[in-house]
Structure formats: C-alpha cells, structure tokens
Regions:
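A glycine/serine/threonine-rich, flexible loop-to-helix segment
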Residues: 2, 6, 33-55
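Active-site helix of classical SDR
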Residues: 10, 18
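Short, small/polar-rich loop/turn modules that mediate ligand/substrate recognition or access, typified
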Residues: 26-30, 81-83
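Conserved SDR Rossmann-fold cofactor-binding beta-strand/turn motif
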Residues: 30-40, 74, 87-89
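A conserved structural motif in NAD(P)-dependent oxidoreductases
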Residues: 55-66, 77
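Short C-terminal tail/terminal secondary-structure segment
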Residues: 71, 82-95
Length: 95
C-alpha cells in the first residue's frame, strides 16, 4: 500500500471492526487486534538504522514479540480485555 491515506483508512476500519465485533460477540468471545511496528527482516542497514533511531526502545520488532502478544491475548491473563488494539512498536507511535 503506497498511499498513507489508504493505509490510515484501512487500519482505522480494522480497529472499528474489532470494536464492533467485541461488542457483538460479548460476553462469550473477546475480540482484539494487534498492530506490530517494523518487524526485523531483511531491511537494508540504512532503513534499520533510521527506524531504530526513531524508536524509544532502540530496536525493531522481533517476530517473537508478536508471538508473545498473541499468547498473552489467548491466555486467561487477558480475559477482561476486549475491543482493543495492542500496539507492539517499541514506542514508535508515541513520538
């Protein structure tokens, strides 16, 4: 997706769909979404350096970070969480 507007609209649509599903399926099903930041893959060194310098935790997201979030949401530890967007971006979006 090359358009920031299209990305923003699609992400916002998913968030509102999540909230609707959470209210519709409650109290029997909890519905949440995950929004990971930049996941470390094969990005070039320049991109990685720029991204890392823009993130308070000073690193990119590892695949395991997303897996741990999913496991948390699947566990009883999150049984009172529904309709939420769990942002896993090392603080990138707070700056």
């Amino acid at each position: 997706m090359n358009s920031p507007a299209a990305y923003s609209v699609s992400k916002n649509s998913l968030f509102h769909l999540t909230k609707w599903q959470a209210s519709y399926f409650a109290p029997h099903v909890n519905v949440n979404m995950i929004s990971p930041g930049g996941i470390l893959r094969n990005q070039n060194k320049r991109f990685r350096k720029k991204y890392i310098n823009s993130t308070p935790l000073q690193r990119m997201c590892y695949e395991e970070d997303v897996v741990f979030a999913i496991l948390f949401l699947l566990s009883d530890l999150s049984n009172y969480i529904t309709g939420q967007n769990l942002i896993i971006d090392g603080g990138y979006t707070i700056l």
